[in-house]
Amino acid sequence: MKTIVRKVALVGATALLATVGYPTSAGAVELTCGATITQSTTLTADLGPCPDYGLHIGANNITLNLNGFRIFGTNEPRDGAGVWMVGRSGVTVTNGIIEFFDAGVAIEGGGGNTVSNMTLQHNIGGLRSFYGDGVAILSSVNNLVTNSTMRNNGPFSGVGLYSLVDGDHPRATTGTSTGNQIIGNVVTDNVAARAGGPVTSTDNDGIRIEPETHGNLISGNIVRNNGLDGIALFAGSSNNIITNNTVEGHGMYRTSVRRGNGIILFNRGTGNVVENNLVRGNADNGIVVQGPVGANAGATNNTIRFNLSFGNSVRPPLNPNPGGPFGGPTFDLQDRNVDCDNNVWFGNRYRTAFPACTTTGGAPI
């Protein structure tokens, strides 16, 4: 059951919808859940519980400074996003906590926004929810997510990049999410399953790059103990750079089809670079490049170099026999294309690898 909205006082240059602003003798205003801010705003107290979105961003080039406070939902499905912006640019959301929504921050369309020094936690979408992530970037470009913690969000990801097409979403701008930078975050324990199901059915990723999402940078993140894969590049996602991340402890929950990998490149992706990552202690493969699926080509013309991948294959594979896109044994390094099919593997260190082309220029440890 949804609960009553709490008001919060804000200071600084703040412009609100006329129906929600209430001047006070101190010169500040009170802001209710669901309000739209159109000037830079600093919180002076917590805001919530909010039953339907926290705050809407209604102008470009403004800053929402949570000032160490939190915006929180009701911990029920369909609470929307804690901070929601559509078609905005130059917005900064910083310095606080957002929890108990369907997404912590949702960026739809627009670009050039920043999420920094935030804790996004316990944001769980449900049936018919629009989101299921700590941060969701939907058909938006050149955004920066940095120095933040994404913990126990889902059921999709800690950070999700989505390139929407017509019919994917009832509101958001369609198009490719490109030029986004996910840098220096801690993305951990995002394990929730869909529709409130058991964690044994989770397909929740740490960082999720959905199909046909190109040209993004994932760098310097600690990605740990998420439900399925640590960093997943979905089908047709190309020219992304995955570098200098620590990726460990994934895939320990799911008990059907497959467990989870440290870093996975799904089929049809090309031109991706996976380099200088530490990948260890994952249930299935450390780093795996998927081969053909039906009529679709495998992931080809990718570069996987100078990674340290060891101590993976922690759990027995669910499909130990070869056959199908996920069948067969698992390794620290694995390419499921025949003879690696124009993928360049070079200078990696590993304990187990298959086939031999994954070991070029590298060395076992």
Language-model regions, residue ranges each:
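Secretory targeting and sorting signals
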Residues: M1-A28
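Right-handed parallel beta-helix/beta-spiral solenoid domain characteristic of secreted/periplasmic
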Residues: V29-E30, T42-P51, T63-D102, I124
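Post-signal peptide N-terminal regions of Sec-secreted extracellular proteins
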Residues: V29-T32, T36-T38, G294, P355-I365
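Short, T/G/N/S-enriched strand-turn elements that build extracellular solenoid repeat scaffolds
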Residues: T32-T36, P51-I57
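Extracellular beta-strand/beta-solenoid scaffold signature
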Residues: P49-G54, E76-W84, F100-I107, G126-L138, ...
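Small-residue (G/S/T/A) turn/hinge positions that recur once per unit in extracellular repeat modules
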Residues: A59-I62, F69, R88-S89, G110, ...
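Acidic, glycine- and Ser/Thr-rich low-complexity intrinsically disordered tracts
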Residues: N302-T303, L308-I365
